[in-house]
Amino acid sequence: MRYLLLPLAVFFLCQCGSPQPPVCRTLPFGSRGAVEPVMETARRNWDILADPRKKQEWPAAENEYNRAVAILFDKLRCENGDGWSARAAAIGTAICAPDKLHEDPNDQDAVFPATEVRIRSSAKHRASQGVGIPAVGWTATSPVGVPRPKFHPPNGQARNLTVTLDFSNKTPQWRFAKRWVTESLAIGENGHHLAADWSAPIDFFWYMCELDDLRIQNVLIPERFTEETGLYFLQPYDPKKIPIVMVHGLVSSPDAYRDILNDLSPEPWFREHYQVWLYNYPTGTPWLYNSMRFRQIISEAGDYVRAHGDDRTLRKMVILSHSMGGLLTRTAVTDPGTKLYHAHFEKPFGQLEPTLKPEARELIREGLLYKPLTDPKRIVF
């Protein structure tokens, strides 16, 4: 038996530690060499893409431009230098100022090519051809069990980015397009479709996030993970988009909607009109309590939305629910009257024992004599 102890110890030690974003410590072999000829290739093909008279050359120019920019992006992220701006300056470029369509890589904890993400299923890999290098931006939060700002998911948020090098000015500028909100890149007076990898940010999020590791624990020891009951915004809140809330079922986690997100993300209508909110809860907790917490947290999200503008999109909220999630949702939007209360108590609420603690009395009222949610417009059970 003792001969098994060392291999077992090694095995369990190898399971320790949280996953980390890719770090480029050495410039890839294919990206080594002088900057100038690669920069000139990128610039020359940019000029072709800017010229409507050379439209027949655009497909080849797009490929050559992307190939050159991929090499330059490797140099930007892998070469020595203190920060993105310093590394950009070292190769004669600059980082464009962030705006509603572009991220600042200095605000991300990691930015790396989408090709560095292990895609769960090649058959379900969703990508779009176009100009630029699909990339993933990662902003870290705290792990499961550690407090974090409200509506921030555990571990972090993944951004869907497309990296381009803009030669419109004397100094080429790196642009990190927020691919979820922008479709094209202006080159000269021509609009060119941006490349995208829709699956990479989703698969990387679930590689980093611990929620999907808690399915069994959430049933057997739900009290250990009640602090992770909550609503998580997959992207920063956008007051112009309709929330679509996804509520998982028994012995499950929000990753139950992973394939749906993967299929919907490439759709422009979905990205234009909707934002995704994932709801997580321990499924081993009594369903009436879970339903109460769902109502409370959706109401808190409503308060957050109204504090950041009007609630027109909130009143168009869509909820997708599955299994136990459907039970929670149906209960949350249905006026119980006194039916739920009288299923548990014979005395009227006002005649309950005076020795009952105030917090217990409030729990009964919130759990059984509540007012239903009114914001959701559409619910899919």
Where are the regions a protein language model picked out?
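Short, surface-exposed alpha-helical segments at coil->helix boundaries
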Residues: P254, R258-N262, L288, M292
